[in-house]
From Swiss-Prot:
Location of this chain's protein in the cell: Cytoplasm
All copies of domain TrmE-type G, residue ranges: 219-378
Organism: Listeria monocytogenes serovar 1/2a (strain ATCC BAA-679 / EGD-e)
Function: Exhibits a very high intrinsic GTPase hydrolysis rate. Involved in the addition of a carboxymethylaminomethyl (cmnm) group at the wobble position (U34) of certain tRNAs, forming tRNA-cmnm(5)s(2)U34.
Residues that coordinate or bind (6S)-5-formyl-5,6,7,8-tetrahydrofolate: R22, E83, R122, K457
Protein name: tRNA modification GTPase MnmE
Length: 457
């Protein structure tokens, strides 16, 4: 498969030390050579070499560059690739790009370089999606999961499962088409059930990693809730180690939602500091309270902050009711002051949810809180080693559908259905697993997936 030659700026826009303009396609080297001036021609350059020179437009030098030449097929796209390393400005880099476009290159679509790597067989679809996961990773663990997926861990596992299914389907087909041959091993219902159970167990094992994998990939939407002036903004500032939220003794200081990402011992949290939830006549504060209620409803995880120096109120108890059904940790703040809170009642309301005491003004209790968060979501252990996580929502949905199809095979066999009937569900499971790696996928889906990428990737 041969495409046209594309070009795009691969580095973020703005000022910086270096900017990279990337070309890929059959004319990549020739197009770059038309605007590059140096001692030797790029067209004569060996693969994987770097060359110093200048970019000229109408005889005028517009950039001093280093150009990397990489010849097919030993490139990311398996096409000829040229990368022009220029100074990280806005004007000069765009002039170089426009010059390339005028000399025959087409502007790349978002994700088109990675899409070509997939279409040319360099990577499969799950590996392509892992590229974006790596770019978006918020923690070292999320980065590790993405790198292992890019390396093909998930792909190999899925392909092995598809091969198991294919072997069984082939045996069934032989039995159906050539029943008269004595030397053909009969695929009995028991044998098919054993094959199915083997694949089904592996799919279930993958799905058991889904909740942790999704957390690592997307982070937890974490609402910090509580009545006004209990220490919510102080908690946000402590967790992100920055004075992001205004902290005063005046109740109702936080009027709007503040969001920040933070890595808590490998657990990525999208912290949402909400306005204190209370009845108020202040129009602006009332809007903030309504937004807080929505953030609470949409949260994956809640930090419910109470003031240990005040008695428990009806509003506090209402927060426990609102948090019901969510994972949450109760934070008893201001332990440096006299305890007036009914701790036994708090334990009763919290049930099995962890309770942590803090004095944020004295930097006390934060380590215990971080440990409680890690333990709540990863049972205290997030070191997965070389374990294969499934974290992509699309992959998870396809695995659930494949599991449903495999369950259909098992049910059909148990009901005594003929093998050639239950193979329909077996074939469906094979197709669904193939959608994960891109072995069976629609063009419309490919366009949708790669359009999520940035330009130049």
């Amino acid at each position: 498969m041969e495409f046209d030659t594309i070009a795009a700026i691969s580095t973020p826009p703005g000022e910086g030390a270096i900017a990279i303009i990337r070309l890929s396609g059959p004319e990549a080297i020739q197009i770059a050579d038309r605007i590059f001036y140096a001692k030797n021609s790029l067209s004569e350059a060996e693969s994987h070499t770097i060359h110093y020179g200048h970019i000229k437009e109408d005889g005028e030098v517009i950039e001093e560059v280093m150009v990397t030449v990489m010849r097919a097929p030993r490139t990311f796209t398996r096409e000829d690739v040229v990368e022009i390393n220029a100074h990280g400005g806005i004007v000069s880099v765009n002039r170089v790009l426009q010059l390339l476009l005028r000399n025959g290159a087409n502007l790349a679509e978002p994700g088109e370089f990675t899409k070509r790597a997939f279409l040319n067989g360099r990577i499969d679809l799950s590996q392509a999606e892992a590229v974006m996961d790596l770019i978006r990773a918020k923690t070292d663990r999320a980065m590790g999961v993405a790198i292992r997926q890019m390396d093909g861990n998930l792909s190999r596992l899925i392909r092995n499962l598809r091969q198991e299914i294919l072997d069984a389907l082939a045996q069934v087909e032989v039995n159906i088409d050539y029943p008269e041959y004595d030397d053909v091993e009969e695929m009995t219902q028991r044998m098919l059930l054993e094959k199915t159970e083997l694949v089904r167990a592996s799919v279930e094992q993958l799905l058991r990693t889904a909740s942790q994998g999704k957390i690592l990939r997307e982070g937890l939407a974490t609402a910090i809730i509580g009545r006004p002036n209990v220490g919510k903004s102080s908690l946000l500032n402590q967790l992100i180690q920055e004075e992001k939220a205004i902290v005063t003794d005046i109740a109702g200081t936080t009027r709007d939602i503040i969001e920040e990402y933070v890595n808590v011992r490998g657990v990525p949290l999208r912290l949402i500091d909400t306005a204190g939830i209370r009845e108020t006549e202040d129009i602006v504060e009332k809007i903030g309270v309504e937004r807080s209620r929505k953030a609470l409803a949409d949260a994956d995880f809640i930090l419910l902050v109470l003031n240990q120096n005040e008695e428990l109120t009806v509003e506090d108890e209402a927060l426990f009711e609102a948090a019901a059904g969510h994972n949450y940790v109760v934070v008893l703040n201001k332990t440096d002051l006299e305890t007036k809170l009914d701790i036994d009642r708090v334990r009763e309301l919290a049930g099995e949810n962890p309770i942590v005491s803090t004095s944020l003004v004295n930097d006390e209790g934060l380590e215990a809180l971080e440990e409680a968060i890690k333990t709540l979501f990863f049972a205290g252990d997030i070191d997965a080693g070389d374990a294969t996580y499934v974290s992509n929502v699309r992959h998870i949905a396809l695995l659930h559908q494949a599991l449903e199809a495999l369950n259909g095979v098992t049910t059909g066999i148990q009901l005594g259905m003929p093998v050639d009937i239950v193979q329909i569900d077996m074939t469906r499971a094979w197709d669904l697993l193939g959608e994960i790696t891109g072995d069976s996928v629609q063009d419309e889906l490919l366009d949708q997936l790669f359009n999520q990428f940035c330009l130049g990737k």
